[in-house]
């Protein structure tokens, strides 16, 4: 099968896993939420990754999420899945992703182990070469590969991009100027809008947007202003929306996931403020703070009506 070997660019959607109060995955809610992201113009769907509580999913739930995402996307945008953890499971889920019609996968770090560079290279290479799907390498935590190792991985045609979740700008600049446009470069830092002004000038033209799950027009407004040099609007969005939400996110471990769900619930989307342990729900005070920020954002930065 001939595939387009190119990483998605722009604002990337990372849907959450909507659980009901009994902790069961709600497929219809997931479908609706992905449709919402697509209608808002997000350029790709990354399903069952960090925001989708990858680490908590059973194989059946993972399969359900991939099926829903592929169905909802309908070929309009590429669908990437999360694969990683222990190598055997990563390979199984990579095969499953290919079988279910995904376009690629994001390679998450191995479980617990801190390997040497050669081991991390072999881990990534084994997963990359296990299918014909496109692969994006996630630089994070215990799996941060050097320029030399990533350059070796570019020999695999399936590798199309690198997502940075570390924030080592010295390494990022070295990567971009050594490897160039052979790969797509994705900003995957928590609340990526905060750091995107530093990433865009060095060649990172994509980012994973948490807030796009509930205020996608703000994320779009921000990115357009950033690209077009509208510094005043960027500052206003920072001051009134992005930094205040980020301040709440930093209050508790796990809020990178659960704060998204709280935001979606506040905005009337079909998601509850529930997450699986060890991630906890957003606490009442923080929930109310987020509610106030979103109300102010809606008043100050209203969504433009769609033109017919």
From Swiss-Prot:
Family named by the database record: Belongs to the DapA family.
Any one GO MF annotation of this record: 5-dehydro-4-deoxyglucarate dehydratase activity
User: Cross-referenced NCBIfam families, in alphabetical order?
Assistant: KdgD (TIGR03249), PRK03620.1 (NF002958)
Protein keywords: Lyase
Which protein, by its recorded name, is this? Answer: Probable 5-dehydro-4-deoxyglucarate dehydratase
Q: Which Pfam families match?
A: DHDPS
Q: What is its EC number?
A: 4.2.1.41
The answer to whether UniProt assigns keyword Methyltransferase to this entry is no
Question: Would you kindly state one Gene Ontology biological process term found in this protein's UniProt entry?
Answer: D-glucarate catabolic process
**Catalytic EC class:** lyase
Reaction catalysed? 5-dehydro-4-deoxy-D-glucarate + H(+) = 2,5-dioxopentanoate + CO2 + H2O
**SMART domains per UniProt:** DHDPS
Pathway the protein acts in? Carbohydrate acid metabolism; D-glucarate degradation; 2,5-dioxopentanoate from D-glucarate: step 2/2
